[in-house]
Swiss-Prot record:
Taxonomic lineage of the native organism: Eukaryota, Metazoa, Chordata, Craniata, Vertebrata
BP terms from Gene Ontology: copper ion transport
Regions crossing the membrane: none
Keyword match Metal-binding: yes
N6-acetyllysine sites (modified residues): K60
Residues annotated as binding Cu cation: C12, C15
Gene name linked to the record: ATOX1
Boundaries of every HMA domain copy: 1-63
InterPro entries noted in UniProt: Copper_transport_ATOX1-like, Heavy-metal-associated_CS, HMA_dom, HMA_dom_sf
Single GO term (MF): metal ion binding
SUPFAM superfamilies (UniProt xref): HMA, heavy metal-associated domain
Subunit structure: Homodimer. Interacts with ATP7B. Interacts with ATP7A. Interacts (via dimer form) with SLC31A1 (via C-terminal domain); this interaction improves ATOX1 stability and controls intracellular Cu(I) levels.
Modification type Phosphoserine: residues: S47
Naturally occurring in which organism (per UniProt): Bos taurus (Bovine)
UniProt name for this protein: Copper transport protein ATOX1
Length: 68
């Protein structure tokens, strides 16, 4: 399963909870949230575009850092 790393502008636990909510709703993903470094690593067969769109639903600034 491909692993991707994203930068997400998270500042608190509420932000990381929002990321957890949207990714769990998408399904088919395993992920780790690194709140201090504002990064999310996702293992998923979903496309990068789908993952970006899903993370964008949190209302936070999101960018794709590349494969991990």
């Amino acid at each position: 399963m491909p692993k991707h790393e994203f930068s997400v502008d998270m500042t608190c636990e509420g932000c990381s909870n929002a990321v957890t909510r949207v990714l769990n709703k998408l399904g088919g993903v395993q992920f780790d949230i690194d709140l201090p470094n504002k990064k999310v690593c996702i293992n998923s067969e979903h496309s990068v575009d789908t993952l970006l769109e899903t993370l964008g639903k949190t209302g936070k600034a999101v960018s794709y850092l590349g494969p991990k």
